[in-house]
Each structure stands twice: as C-alpha cells, then as structure tokens.
C-alpha cells in the first residue's frame, strides 16, 4: 500500500513497519504507551528511533486507537483511523490499517476445562511445571499456550525436552535466559538482564559498551551506519555475566554466543581469554567484555 497505519509499536508492529517502509510505503505507527518497543531500554531503542525518523516514519505515542471506517470505493477507497492523543481525537486517512496489538490466547472452546487441566491466574494460559507437565496426568503443554515468552525457539526447546521425557529421560526446562531478537532496522538482541533490571534486583554491576563503528567486519557490512553497539552487564564482585544487549545490522547472528555465555555462567574473563577470529562481528562481544574489565583496546 502507498500508506499504512500500524496500531501497536511493539516488536511485531515495528518489524513490519520497517519492512513496509523499505518497500516504499508511508508508515505511521500509533502506540498507546510512552515509548515504542517498551520491552527494551532507551539506549537500545535509540538507533532504531533514529532510523525511523530518517526514513520519515511518523510515530504517535500515548495514542489510543478508537476505531476505523472505510470511505469511498474503488481506486479512491481509503480507511480513516480514529485515535485519541493528548485528550484530542485525531483522524488518519490511509490505504490500509495493520493491527498488531490485542493478541489473546485461543484457549477457549477446546475442551481443556473438561480434562482437569489447570490454567494460570489470568485464566488464559495453561499452568505447567519445569517439565511442561500440566495438572492432568500424561498431558504436556509447550509454547505459546503455556505463556510468555511466546517465542518459536522456546516452544521448540520445550518440545524437544518433552519428547525426551516421554522417552524415559530425566529432563527439566531450566533456562537461565531465552534470547529475544527484534528484526527491525537495525536489529536488536537482548539476553538476560539489562542494566536497569539488574540494579532493580539489587545487583551491583559493571557495564561495558563497544561501538560497531570500531569493528572491521561491521564496517564492511556498513553496520556502523546504524550507530549500533554491543553492551555487557556483569556482576561487579565476581564478574559473572548477567546480560548482553546489542543493536545494529546483523547482530542477530551474535545471539548464539550471547546466550551460550549466560547459560554456562561465563565470567568476563572467560570471554576475554577466548580468541575471536578477525575480522568478524563476534569481536564486538569480546571488545565489550574487555571494556567492562577496563582493558579496552579499540575504544576509549
């Protein structure tokens, strides 16, 4: 479409918004909260916000969509989106409206209530234990039906575990963290805790950040143009890595090393003492760890 309004500034709305913008659509995002992508902290969001502004994506925050009405016919057909912002009603005329909010679990009407399966406090998701067992003997639940995070890779891991349990193996779903990736422009990766989350849990942390503009491989991929970086959050006293975040082109490919570091309880020194090939994007992780330790080589 020539113009599209996206209701919802979460990861789904932003991923599709970036894609539509690159395809030539005029995109407007209507978000009810104070910020877009509120699941990420301000520092991580900033390069994305710069990209959206540069590509003339209009963003309305603290705006609540109230309804839509189709006007005209044929080539002149438009959709009017009505939304409230700053105690005023606004109307936006576009070719299409994409609603990316308001997802609800489709857990009603399947006879679950007749099988002795207990739901969580919200009544929407199936309650499970660390082996994905439900309250009904012999019945397991994995993926979205069992609640957040509703991610395909979590569901796959749970499914593999349940298959092994059924085969007689002793397994539990005890993950330190599950990677969250936002495929926007630029990409965003987060595993574990960000600085604010760590401090809210009473952790005394040290933080290191390395810019992609100082990474040779990122320069060849033009990833430095996004203002991206890799950030490491570690406990100050024992140097255990608590979280890793990254923003920039192609950073999704770094998520495997990030999550492995957390899952294995890596210390900053473990990563610092690991040789990372040059020139690769993974050097950015190594450099951010060195920065956290105060031994930065390619940044100040």
Regions found by a protein language model. Give the residues of each.
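Short loop/turn motifs at secondary-structure junctions and domain boundaries
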Residues: 75, 116-118, 221-227
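Rossmann-like dinucleotide-binding cores of NAD(P)H-dependent redox enzymes
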Residues: 2-5, 11-90, 149-156, 164-197
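Conserved phosphate-binding and hydrolysis motifs of nucleotide-dependent enzymes
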Residues: 8-13, 102, 143, 243
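Short, acidic, Ser/Thr-enriched surface-loop or helix-capping motifs
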Residues: 54, 86, 121, 128-130, ...
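Glycine/Thr-rich phosphate-binding loops of Rossmann-like dinucleotide-binding domains
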Residues: 14-15, 107-109, 149, 218, ...
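Flexible, glycine-rich terminal cap/loop adjacent to redox cofactors
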Residues: 167, 183-194, 199-300
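Short, surface-exposed charged micro-motifs
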Residues: 67, 116, 131, 231-233
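FAD-site-proximal beta/loop scaffold in flavoenzymes
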Residues: 1, 91-166
